Amino acid sequence: MAIPKAHYSLAVLVLLFVVVSSSQKVCNPECKAKEPFHCDNTHAFNRTGFPRNFTFGAATSAYQIEGAAHRALNGWDYFTHRYPEKVPDRSSGDLACDSYDLYKDDVKLLKRMNVQAYRLSIAWSRVLPKGRLTGGVDENGITYYNNLINELKANGIEPYVTIFHWDVPQTLEDEYGGFLSTRIVEDYTNYAELLFQRFGDRVKFWITLNQPFSLATKGYGDGSYPPGRCTGCELGGDSGVEPYTVAHNQLLAHAKTVSLYRKRYQKFQGGKIGTTLIGRWFAPLNEFSELDKAAAKRAFDFFVGWFLDPLVYGKYPTIMREMVGDRLPEFTPEQSALVKGSLDFLGLNYYVTQYATDAPPPTQLNAITDARVTLGFYRNGVPIGVVAPSFVYYPPGFRQILNYIKDNYKNPLTYITENGVADLDLGNVTLATALADNGRIQNHCSHLSCLKCAMKDGCNVAGYFAWSLMDNYEFGNGYTLRFGMNWVNFTNPADRKEKASGKWFSKFLAK
């Protein structure tokens, strides 16, 4: 009989991990094993190499583009104003791209790019100022999103809606600590149901969470994101416990919401619901070291498996349960059944692959270091891939992680909900330089070629969303990193200009 993949021994899992890591090393538009993996001719490589029903889109999120006008405070508002030093340029999303007023201009950019879909998020505090239904619904916020969704549909663009993209209403943080409390599960589910009721007749793709790993580790592991909690942080915290609590409550909120949608709305609204996870891949620093091979596997389990294992198998990875012990919450049998299989599709945000090497036990308990792995982008001074201002990117890792998920997580229907690269802007970049973003063209083209290869390998991928539609507020980096295919003047956000990458993507999709 076949052994369920969830029950494989650690040794077999490590072997599978290394086999995937050492194969599919090269990607190009023809999927042939030759260097370089990047696209030599971006004019020849276009969407015709993908299935006709494959979805191409662009992505943003509410806090990063809308501005704070006409909505109640969320955690990012409070955090950036109380701790401006946490952001390099001491900025906030108070104005950002002013998409609250300029949403029609946003749709024009999407239309010009020839995309079929737009991934956006709803600002929880814009529709529920008090964070919960009993505090009342802001009908102006509902109207804003109705107008945006209707504008998208009128232009033939399918909305993919993220319900929660890290912007917890500040009232819920103040009242009970946000995702530290199980109380948020009910409030989140009620909020999600409001969205299903008001927008579900037109929205057919729902994403419950964006990268729950990031909220847990950055918000509660090192305090670099709201609410700024960690061991030793001004606001207090416990980096060895709270990230696991927050992750657990996010999973329960997701699962309860999916159950509700499936029972009450899916049949007559005809939509799908899933979630988006961080899609980071890892390679052993020393490919001949068994310790480093195991470290790469642990890194995946602590970054991705932390959430994907419960969603597919109903429990946390074995290695996490062994290493974290009673600091890792347990699912009750009922919770396990609720979480298991709570995906119509998987959203994956892929940006980087890192080298992993075995590390000694940390001196202080922290979810960020519990895996006992040291990560980096260089081996003997040589970068793993292409050096960019924001990080080092490695497109073949894209193919590798998709194959690993195919082989170990039942090959779920998958959408690449984010992929891209940033340019650094410290206020000294000319407009001409900003618009000539040929490096971004190379980034997207090379990743798309590797994605095409992964699909030929049998990976069940149905869509790709470029991050981002336009330059925006990049959370902990403020306005110093620009990921957009369209340039934005942040002192006058109505001033937007198409970058070379935007023109390239438009041509890529026009074929």
UniProtKB/Swiss-Prot annotation:
Specifically expressed in roots. GO terms for molecular function: beta-glucosidase activity; thioglucosidase activity. Its EC number is 3.2.1.147, 3.2.1.21. A beta-D-glucoside binds at Q64, H165, N210, Q211, Y351, E418, W467, E474, F475, F483. The keyword Hydrolase applies. It catalyses: a thioglucoside + H2O = a sugar + a thiol; Hydrolysis of terminal, non-reducing beta-D-glucosyl residues with release of beta-D-glucose. Glycans are attached at N46, N53, N428, N489. Belongs to the glycosyl hydrolase 1 family. This is Myrosinase 4. It comes from Arabidopsis thaliana (Mouse-ear cress).
